[in-house]
Amino acid sequence: GADLHSTAVWDEEKGKWILNGEKWLISHTDCSQFSYVICVTDPDKKGDDRLSAFFVPMDKPGFELVPMPHMMGCKGAGHAGLKFTNLKLDPIYLLGEEGQGMKVAMHSLAVSRVHIATSNLGISQRMFEMSIARARDRVTFGKPIIKRQAIKMKIANMQMMIHALRCLVYDFAQDFDIDQHNDYIDEKAAIAKLFSIDTVRLVSDEMLEIFGGDGYFEDSPYGPTELLYRDCRAMWLEEGAPTVQRITIAKGIEDH
């Protein structure tokens, strides 16, 4: 989460870092062999300087996967909690230098956030295409609903948001390819992720209205509307909630 409480204390006698703490709602734990963890290594310091990053093999003694309640969507993502109890790490497992944890985190988060934005783009495009097909086939009062002005407004809004999101994702990808360490990467990644949430939310809501009751069935004959509607809700939270994205964007503007 955004509030970091896990700690790593240097044991001078043993020459190892000792990790204690918990991380909640971690994805893909069912197929991973390692994780990277941001810990407080110097509580006396303020701000980002107190944080460090570690590479943590998941077979280390003191590492525990904590089962989570079943989620309403993303059934195949393998979510779990991580618990560290006096987990010992040699110095080679420190990523970068001590005090660089936030730098490591933000660099990886920028890529992960755009992965989420790209996923939302794909989900939105799929829902849009399904909505167009259904609007052409669904007939009310003698004509397809795609001919009705209210439905046209929905379709236009969906297309507008999807096109804008695609431009944001491509813009980030271009900048990242040119220089992945430029000063605007974190800010642009947060913008893309945040806008992708607004996009997938609007598109999923409009899709459900276009499908009507048929879109609310688990086994709808017209496509996986219910599954997509549930799965895309997880995107609000992954790699930082909307409020965290706004803080990142504002901080980028302030720093520049």
Which stretches of residues belong to each language-model region?
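Alpha-helical interface subdomain recognition
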Residues: G1-D3, W10-K16, K83, H107-H256
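Well-ordered beta-strand scaffold positions
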Residues: E22, L87, G213-D214
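A short core secondary-structure module
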Residues: K16-L65
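Short, surface-exposed loop/turn microsegments at beta-strand edges and helix-strand junctions
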Residues: K60-G62, G73-K75, E98-Q100, P221-L228
